Amino acid sequence: MSLVIKNLQRVVPIRRVPLRRKMDLVRSILGVKKFDLGIICVDNKTIQNINRIYRNKNVPTDVLSFSFHENLKAGEFPQPHSPDDYNLGDIFLGVEYILQHCRESEDYCDVLTVTATHGLCHLLGFTHSSKAEWQKMYNQEKLVLEELSRYTGARLQPLSRGLY
């Protein structure tokens, strides 16, 4: 199905083609290419507003995920009942925030890919609210990014690295 990447900000230039290519690979690795996915790139003001409304945190952040399917357990695939259910949800990338926290030695597109992969794991039920949940999420991210690295040659590390 489709991967839609929308850039709703003008602060940071976004190269959508490489991001799309990498996220299509991530979707293949995870086995979710038959599901629609939205990735929306926003600035600090917008991501802060969304974070305030949905998480009661009035600060910008790197990624927010909104799953189409509720109550998925870590690693479960959605069980669509109709064609309209073939949707994973939307990932909002705070691209300005991500750029501000990107190290000089890091490739910005790689960091966007890692962050979007983290968001996609959330859409598949992974969380990091406890050490046990974090370990599952970290392992999943690591597995996916290692496989992606084989295709791209990049050395990608999970976003959730070092949370616990």
UniProtKB/Swiss-Prot annotation:
Note on how the cofactor is bound: Binds 1 zinc ion.
Tell me the InterPro entries matching this sequence.
Answer: MetalPrtase_cat_dom_sf_prd, YbeY, YbeY_CS
Would the keyword Repeat be found if you checked this record's keyword annotation?
no
Taxonomic superkingdom: Eukaryota
Q: Which residues cross the membrane?
A: none
Gene Ontology cellular-component terms for this entry are: mitochondrion; nucleus
A GO biological process this protein is involved in?
Answer: rRNA processing
One GO MF term on file is: metalloendopeptidase activity
Q: Where does Zn(2+) bind?
A: H118, H122, H128
What is this enzyme's EC? 3.1.-.-
> What are the protein's UniProt keywords?
Endonuclease, Hydrolase, Metal-binding, Nuclease, Zinc
EC top class, as a word:
hydrolase
Query: So which cofactors does this thing need?
Result: Zn(2+)
| Role | Single strand-specific metallo-endoribonuclease involved in rRNA maturation.
Q: What PANTHER family does UniProt report for this protein, alphabetically?
A: ENDORIBONUCLEASE YBEY, CHLOROPLASTIC (PTHR46986:SF1)
Protein name according to UniProt? Endoribonuclease YbeY
Lineage of the native species?
Eukaryota, Metazoa, Chordata, Craniata, Vertebrata
